[in-house]
From Swiss-Prot:
Gene3D superfamilies: Formin, FH2 domain, Leucine-rich Repeat Variant. This is Formin-like protein 3. Residues 561-951 form the FH2 domain. It comes from Mus musculus. The modification Phosphoserine is found at residues 174, 1014. A lipid is attached at residue 2 (N-myristoyl glycine). The gene is Fmnl3. It is a lipid-anchor. It is found in: Cytoplasm; Cell membrane.
Length: 1028
């Protein structure tokens, strides 16, 4: 424990004993003084930052209790007291009798020193180790002195053989010659150098006979064991650990302590060395110490003595456990796999594997665990080679399986497309039957109406006939009565009371001629003659060559073709943006004559100033003309430069002559001209301006050989009859099958998805549940509704519960699982919605119409040219196009029906909006189901944890149960840390050594593979919180 005060004491004073002060009820000081004293206590306790932070949060009452507890212990002896006593034991001039008296209390002094190093505050330890006291040097020297007699016993010096003593002294001098004296204090660079240097340090000053006899007295006691405990206490502090690791021979002396006859001491040494191996940089130091051990003890092989002790001292289980643990760690804690195999082979040569086979059936469970841990960590090179070969075979198998899976995937896609086609075909048949049913219903209704009408007419006629039968006798009686009355009254009397105008109406009309039909309207006048065509043809570009300027008449404008200019030197390019020839007319440039200006300029000086670099002397223009005349004549080009260059590139790709290309276009030969080339060539259909320029060139009867290859091709190309229609027809012929294969699956997807969505009963029930919950939530505020837009399905995730942990969709998924489990897989009834969601029906219908127009173009061309290629194409593909058009109509009708069925408008809701609603809903529903399952598992874990905590509280009432729980938690935590992918690293922090030793006693060391690291470590947080 940390202490605040210390009092000096001489070497003869009694040992340091913790003095328990009476508890007393000391009143609490003022807050300022309390904080000062509490700060001192915290600094003396040397706690980690997080633990110190927790203590600072205590209230003043708890702080005062802690101060009182800490101040009950005071250090009676300062560090130099123990140092002086140890130095007195090392005095070579002391008489043997006096030494016997002194050495009687050596073990007691060392034990008190160990307690002080372990329990006193860090300030006391630092004082013991500072440069003034050099307590570590004194302690290591005493350890060396205590066991030097053991080293001489290995040479048979127990009997005092002078020859052997001289031999050892001579051997020591030869070792001393390996290193110069000034190199003794330098840090080690490798194991061999360190071993040689430490041997020199140990034996450069050999002890006398009196010192050896004194050493034998010490070796018979527990001084070596307690010295190791003191060093272990020092190394448990970061400051002390660094000092021990940098000490010239501290670790070597610890390793040499393995020669002690006490098995407890050997076990303690091995535990300490194993812990050092697991600290960063410690493994190299331990190996160097055993190199030194080999030189000092004259081993033939490193670790030879260790294996000898391991085999011979089988009666002490603790030592064997510690030895097996050390071997496991020193071999398997390295990251370099090759070095690990090397260390493993070192112990194999020393007979470790044979001994382990004999010891595997030991009765000690601890030893069995350590042996099994080593065997589990063994790096089997042969097995790795076999695994590598197996891996190669497995990789080949994986490739085969991947290829097989690829074929199966393709087959699955084909089956899916075939299934979709069948569904679409059935849907089309269903729609056709529905249409027929509607027609039959309509016919039935019309027939029923006609029958009803006929029955009504028959009934009316029968009633009229009956009335007539009843009225005929009366009519005859009235006629007879009326005749008699007319006979009594004359005709003049009848007409006397009638006005003249009425008499005229009663008089019969005079006969008239038959009315002739009206003549037809005059024909409309003939339309006026069309106006003259405007000048739309662009003027021809200037033609290169040495020919004189030529004036071409194009429409109403005249463009003079400029002759090319020959220069003496190559000149740089002026990157201007040129106007096109058809843009010149009406501008200022049409009024300029730059050729006339050239006659007035000093062109020689211009070329000299602006010529490009690295050119030879100027060429004589006359000579140049003569040489040019000897060469092939320069070509004339009529096409625009970039267009001509692109055309040349396209023609080179074809690898055909102009005649072959034009002949193939005449015959619609797609074998000679691939469709890709046809589509590229369609970009170079001659414009009207180009045709005029080419025709003008021909009318002038200029030689065609002077034209560039592109211009000659364009000349032949433009003479092809109905060129535009032929090229469009060829492109249609070449792309028809691809378009058909592209459009058919899209239409089938629309048809199949529309049918599945419309006919899904489970989807209807899901919507019914959503409608019910929505009305339940909204009825009090907005009133109940009879339906909702499908876009409302996206809002199910936005409606969250009060604790914000669940959405309405999660609740629906939970409700379906509990109340309607048959609806849980409703999405299996919605076929092909994902494919339909990616279809733009409007574009597909436009493409189908384009195919129809293209087929009509082929029909016209076939009627004009009667080409066999076109006839064969029509006979083969007209039926396919008709079927595609019917499918398009069916898809449109099926989609319109399903959209209206769900209350949407086909005009405002395309398939790319309608079907993705279902895709998102299905995906969100599945995720909600998974999250519900995860939440359920988490709740179960929390419930079990809560029950375990309650049981733990009940069981933790007894100390034994509490310790058992702590131990189980510690082991579980350690195993979790071992299983981590990224291993934490032990740094040199306070408490590290004790943490490692505690861990290794609880859990055996487990090595890592080459890819994951090969060492077991604990992280810093584990030191601070769980103390391993």
């Amino acid at each position: 424990m940390g202490n605040l005060e210390s009092t000096d004491g001489g070497p003869g004073e009694p040992p340091s004993v913790p003095l328990l002060l009476p508890p007393g009820k000391t009143p609490m000081p003022e807050p300022c003084e309390l904080e000062e004293r509490f700060a001192l206590v915290l600094s003396s306790m040397n706690l980690p930052p997080d633990k110190a932070r927790l203590l600072r949060q205590y209230d003043n009452e708890k702080k005062w209790d802690l101060i009182c507890d800490q101040e009950r212990f005071q250090v009676k002896n300062p560090p130099h007291t123990y140092i002086q006593k140890l130095q007195s034991f090392l005095d070579p001039n002391v008489t043997r009798k006096k030494f016997r008296r002194r050495v009687q209390e050596s073990t007691k002094v060392l034990r008190e020193l160990e307690i002080s190093l372990r329990t006193n505050h860090i300030g006391w330890v630092r004082e013991f180790l500072n440069d003034e006291n050099k307590g570590l040097d004194v302690l290591v020297d005493y350890l060396s002195f205590a066991q030097c007699s053991v080293m001489f016993d290995f040479e048979g010096l127990e009997s005092g053989d002078d020859g052997a003593f001289d031999k050892l002294r001579s051997w020591s001098r030869s070792i001393e010659d390996l290193q110069p004296p000034n190199a003794l204090s330098a840090p080690f660079t490798n194991s061999l150098a360190r071993s040689a240097r430490q041997s020199v340090l140990r034996y450069s000053t050999l002890p006398g006979r009196r010192a050896l006899k004194n050493s034998r007295l010490v070796s018979q006691k527990d001084d070596v064991h307690v010295c190791i405990l003191c060093l272990r206490a020092i190394m448990n502090y970061q400051y002390g650990f660094n000092l021990v690791m940098s000490h010239p021979h501290a670790v070597n002396e610890i390793a040499l302590s393995l020669n002690n006859k006490n098995p407890r001491t050997k076990a303690l040494v091995l535990e300490l060395l194993a812990a050092v191996c697991l600290v960063r940089g410690g493994h190299e130091i331990i190996l160097a110490a055993f190199d030194n051990f080999k030189e000092v003890c004259k081993e033939l092989h490193r670790f030879e003595k260790l294996m000898e002790y391991f085999r011979n001292e089988d009666s002490n289980i603790d030592f064997m456990v510690a030895c097996m643990q050390f071997i496991n760690i020193v071999v398997h804690s390295v990251e370099d796999m090759n070095f690990r195999v090397h260390l493993q082979y070192e112990f194999t040569k020393l007979g470790l594997e044979e001994f382990l086979q004999k010891s595997r059936h030991t009765e000690s469970e601890k030893l069995q665990v350590q042996i099994q841990a080593y065997l589990d960590n063994v790096f089997d090179v042969g097995g790795l080679l076999e695994d590598a070969e197996t891996k190669n075979v497995a990789l080949e198998k994986v490739e085969e399986l991947e290829e097989h899976v690829s074929h199966l995937t393709e087959k699955l896609l084909d089956l899916e497309n075939e299934n979709m086609m069948r569904v679409a075909e059935l849907e089309k048949q269903l729609l056709q039957r529905e249409k027929e049913l509607e027609s039959i219903k309509e016919t039935y209704e019309n027939t029923s109406n006609q029958v009803h009408t006929l029955r009504r007419l028959i009934k009316e006629k029968e009633e009229a006939f009956q009335r007539r039968c009843h009225l005929e006798p009366s009519a005859r009686g009235l006629e007879s009565m009326g005749g008699e009355a007319l006979a009594r009254v004359g005709p003049t009397e009848l007409t006397e009371g009638i006005p003249p105008s009425d008499l005229d109406l009663l008089a019969p009309a005079p006969p008239t001629e038959e009315t002739l039909p009206l003549p037809p309207p005059p024909a409309p006048p003939l339309p006026p003659p069309p106006p003259p065509l405007p000048d739309k043809c662009p003027p021809a570009p200037p033609l290169p060559g040495a020919a004189p300027s030529v004036v071409l008449t194009v429409g109403l404008s005249a463009i003079r073709i400029k002759k090319p200019i020959k220069t003496k030197f190559r000149l740089p390019v002026f990157n201007w943006t040129a106007l096109k020839p058809n843009q010149i007319n009406g501008t200022v440039f049409s009024e300029l004559d730059d050729e006339k200006i050239l006659e007035d300029l000093d062109l020689d000086r211009f070329e000299e100033l602006f010529k490009t670099k690295a050119q030879g002397p100027a060429l004589d223009l006359i000579c140049s003309k003569n040489k040019t005349a000897q060469k092939a004549a320069s070509k004339v080009t009529l096409l625009e430069a970039n267009r001509a260059k692109n055309l040349a590139i396209t023609l080179r790709k074809a690898g055909r002559s102009a005649e072959e290309i034009c002949r193939a276009i005449h015959t619609f030969d797609l074998q000679t001209l691939p469709v890709d080339f046809v589509e590229c060539l369609m970009r170079f259909l001659p414009t009207e301006a180009e045709v005029k320029l080419l025709r003008q060139y021909e009318r002038e009867r200029q030689p065609l050989e002077e034209l560039a290859a592109e211009d000659r091709f364009m000349l032949l190309f433009s003479k092809v009859e109905r060129l535009t229609q032929r090229m469009a027809g060829m492109a249609f012929l070449g792309n028809f099958q691809d378009n058909l294969q592209m459009l058919t699956p899209q239409l089938n997807a629309i048809i199949a998805a529309s049918a599945s969505v419309k006919s899904s009963q489970k989807l209807k029930q899901m919507l019914e549940i959503i409608l019910a919950l929505g009305n339940y939530m909204n009825s009090s505020k907005r009133g109940a509704v009879y339906g909702f837009k499908l876009q409302s399905l996206d809002l199910l995730l936005d409606t969250k519960s009060t604790d914000r942990k669940m959405t309405l969709l999660h609740f629906i998924a939970l409700t379906v699982k509990e109340k309607y489990p048959e609806l849980a897989n409703f999405w299996q009834e919605l076929h092909f919605v994902e494919k339909a969601a990616a279809v733009s029906l409007e574009n597909v219908l436009l493409d189908v119409k384009e195919l129809g127009r293209g087929m009509e173009l082929i029909r016209r061309e076939c009627s004009i040219h009667d080409n066999s290629v076109l006839r064969n194409f029509l006979s083969t593909n007209e039926g396919k196009l008709d079927k595609l058009q019917r499918d398009a109509k069916t898809a449109e009708e099926a989609y319109n029906a399903v959209v209206r069925y769900f209350g949407e408008s086909p005009k405002t809701t395309p398939p790319s909006v309608f079907f993705p609603v279902f895709v998102r809903f299905i995906r969100s529903y599945k995720e909600a189901e998974q999250e519900n399952e995860a939440r359920k598992k988490q709740e179960e874990v929390m419930r079990e944890k809560q029950l375990a905590q309650e049981a733990k509280k009940l069981d933790a009432k007894t100390p034994s149960q509490r310790n058992k729980w702590q131990q189980q938690e510690l082991i579980a935590e350690l195993r979790r840390r071992q299983a981590k992918e990224h291993r934490p690293v032990y740094e040199g922090k306070d408490g590290t050594i004790e943490d490692i030793i505690t861990v290794l006693k609880s859990v055996p060391f487990t090595a890592r593979t080459a890819k994951r690291g090969s060492r077991f470590f604990c992280d810093a947080a584990h030191h601070d919180e769980s103390n391993c």
